[in-house]
A protein has these predicted regions:
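Positively charged, small/polar-rich N-terminal and surface patches that mediate targeting and assembly
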Residues: 1-118
Length: 118
């Protein structure tokens, strides 16, 4: 099998993006998600500036952006968890399915498996 055909076997994963008001809130949410195995990895992009209309006014805020990498099987649960534990009244939660390399996708799937109760 050639290297090209080995690399073309992709695994579907789900990426979930959200923003938080500060590093304390971002770190807490990221740690909870990893601890509960709802995502295999959380990437913190750092501060971004968001402009949006809220209650009839244009607002601007500096926020921390997080990108969660999870499996198809855990994506809905992750979205519900973020929504329930987010400090904003209407949090930005955007998700999309993506193809990952086979090894990375398998790692995400393995790391987001529910632990077996023994």
């Amino acid at each position: 099998m050639s290297i090209v055909s080995e690399l073309s076997v992709n695994t579907p994963v789900v990426l979930v993006l959200t923003t938080l008001p500060d590093s304390e809130a971002a770190s807490a949410l990221a740690q909870q998600v990893i601890d509960t195995r709802l995502a295999a990895c959380v990437t913190e992009f750092g501060m971004v500036k968001s402009r949006y209309r809220w209650n009839g006014k244009v607002e601007a805020a500096e926020e921390l952006q997080l990108l969660f990498k999870t499996s198809l099987a855990r994506s809905d649960e992750l979205t519900r968890f973020i929504e329930a534990n987010h400090p904003y009244e209407t949090p930005e939660i955007v998700s999309w399915q993506a193809d990952a390399s086979a090894a990375y996708g398998q790692w995400i799937t393995a790391e987001t498996q529910r632990p077996l109760n023994v």
